[in-house]
Amino acid sequence: RTNRNRNKITAKEQRELREKTIGIVGLSVGSAFAMSLAMERTCGALKVADFDDLELSNLNRIQTGIKNLGLPKWIAISRAIAEVDPYFEVEVYSRGLTSSNASDFFDGLDLVCDACDQVSAKALIRFEARKAEIPVLMETSDRGMLDIERYDQGVEGYLHGRISEEMLNDMMNANEWSPEFFNAFIDLSQASAR
């Protein structure tokens, strides 16, 4: 099924990638990442965390149909992955990423993708990734920014030094975004007008 990968990923690289486990927190935007990884088999297993149900407003970000409205996002995405590759391993965290399951979620990960909206989850991702020494990949829709935090290379601080220990703790206990938190993730002075 993946024989066309040979022109862009060598056989040796494919063998190495089969041993990798990638975590995705948030399955709206994260669903595209999950589907690409499954279609190309560019990792051996996925761990996905999302607690939300599929709503009509999600259909601009999730490639699915109205038949899946009301289902948990993880069910819709897991089914779509199984239709492409029924042998692809997907481990689901149906309550999303929480302080009670974060240690288990991060166990064995080689990379984590931050595709969630909750400020507390974003902070928890960075706290756990730094502890586990794995990179964080985050895409934001503002200006199409792709951010890579290399906690696997001994990086100090969080989000390239934009988040202090104190702010991270505040974020992990927050129920909503503050202007200060938002500015840490998207430099408001550089943000697009929209």
Name these PLM-found stretches.
Residues 1-22:
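N-terminal charged helix/coil linker that caps or initiates catalytic domains
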Residues 15, 35, 104, 123-127:
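Alpha-helical segments flanking ligand/cofactor-binding loops in enzyme cores
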Residues 48-85:
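Glycine-rich phosphate-binding loop and adjoining beta1-alpha1-beta2 segment
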Residues 74-110, 116-123:
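A structured beta-alpha segment of the ubiquitous adenosine-cofactor-binding alpha/beta core
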